[in-house]
Swiss-Prot record:
The chain crosses the membrane at residues 33-60, 71-91, 105-126, 144-168, 201-220, 238-262, 280-303. Sulfated on at least 2 of the N-terminal tyrosines. Sulfation is required for efficient binding of the chemokines, CCL3 and CCL4. Residues 61-70, 127-143, 221-237, 304-354 are cytoplasmic. Pfam families: 7tm_1 (PF00001). The gene is Ccr5. Coiled coil: none annotated. It comes from Rattus norvegicus (Rat). This is C-C chemokine receptor type 5. It is found in: Cell membrane.
Length: 354
């Protein structure tokens, strides 16, 4: 498959898009050995972390704020994305054996989860901006109802931008094996290939970073007027960590994606360069996937409020079930945890929202 998009990239034996057929047996062999264990690790760690966020929000926090709504939907997006990885891992090691319907279904789930995760990260960034920079306005604007409405709209947008991948993906026999790959009419191939790549780069890198720069610049300006220097320094460090982590995890993939799609314009449309780009795609794509493992840490567990709920959940559901005589760990007062953090000022958002 010589089309490069956000679907996990599997390279087959020959690339016919070159002027002369390009043998890619070695690239496929490396993918078969490298990708399944990496995808498995991403699936395990990402599933555990996001499932913990999901369960805590349902059982402890009860989705009482707009932030909770967005965190809940971010966890769902990451879980949808992650649930497809075992199938892509099998595909990387073998061939596509799940049929055409499942090819389209898993492609759709993968992309909807992928774009949904990006969009909810953007909404969380805007939510923090409103809470800290426009604290008085945020009291009226940041409601559960508004969070639900914007979440529904976000899912609709995520489905819409995923439609081209769902429509064009098809399972068919190519040579001696079955593939799950996009199939365009020959006259449309170049247009859709460029369109998909530019859509990916704009939605997954340029737009999120633009929103982060604008919102976090406003937040930093407000934080520098905060009287509590300790909270200010902690919040500033977290802001830079969020931006740097997102940039480091997704920029390499998007750069390689651009180079691969427009390789003829960079003088890279030869077999050796194509093979190196394919190998780089495998590494950078997996690196980008691991970002969903960090979302629970960056957007949930880093907050003091959420860590208290995690402690309550652990004691109530884990310790109580597996250590019935450990009474010291079961002395939990959930009401106290929820009542400690009821203030809604800008400074409180600095300490708990960030």
């Amino acid at each position: 498959m010589d089309f490069q998009g956000s679907i996990p990239t599997y390279i087959y034996d020959i690339d016919y898009s070159m002027s002369a057929p390009c043998q890619k047996v070695n690239v496929k062999q490396i993918a078969a050995q490298l990708l399944p264990p990496l995808y498995s690790l991403v699936f395990i760690f990402g599933f555990v972390g996001n499932m913990m966020v999901f369960l805590i929000l349902i059982s402890c926090k009860k989705l009482k704020s707009m932030t909770d709504i967005y965190l809940f939907n971010l966890a769902i997006s990451d879980l949808l994305f992650l649930l497809t990885l075992p199938f892509w891992a099998h595909y990387a090691a073998n061939e596509w054996v799940f049929g055409n319907i499942m090819c389209k279904l898993f492609t759709g789930i993968y992309h909807i989860g992928y774009f949904g995760g990006i969009f909810f990260i953007i909404l969380l960034t805007i939510d923090r901006y409103l809470a800290i920079v426009h604290a008085v306005f945020a009291i009226k604007a940041r409601t559960v109802n508004f969070g639900v409405i914007t979440s529904v709209v976000t899912w609709v947008v995520a489905v819409f931008v995923s439609l081209p991948e769902i429509i064009f993906m098809r399972s068919q026999k190519e040579g001696s094996h079955y593939t799950c790959s996009p199939h365009f009419l020959h006259i449309q191939y170049r247009f859709w290939k460029h369109f998909q790549t530019l859509k990916m780069v704009i939605l997954s890198l340029i737009l999120p970073l633009l929103v982060m720069v604008i919102c976090y610049s406003g937040i930093l300006n407000t934080l520098f007027r905060c009287r509590n220097e300790k909270k200010r320094h902690r919040a500033v460090r977290l802001i830079f960590a969020i931006m740097i982590v997102y940039f480091l995890f997704w920029t390499p993939y998007n750069i390689v994606l651009l180079l691969t799609t427009f390789q003829e314009y960079f003088g890279l449309n030869n077999c050796s360069s194509s093979n190196r780009l394919d190998q780089a795609m495998q590494v950078t794509e997996t690196l980008g996937m691991t970002h969903c493992c960090l979302n629970p840490v960056i957007y949930a567990f880093v907050g003091e409020k959420f860590r208290n709920y995690l402690s309550v959940f652990f004691r109530k559901h884990i310790v109580k079930r597996f250590c019935k005589h450990c009474s010291i760990f079961q002395q939990v007062n959930p009401d106290r945890v929820s009542s400690v953090y009821t203030r809604s000022t800008g400074e409180q958002e600095v300490s708990t929202g960030l």
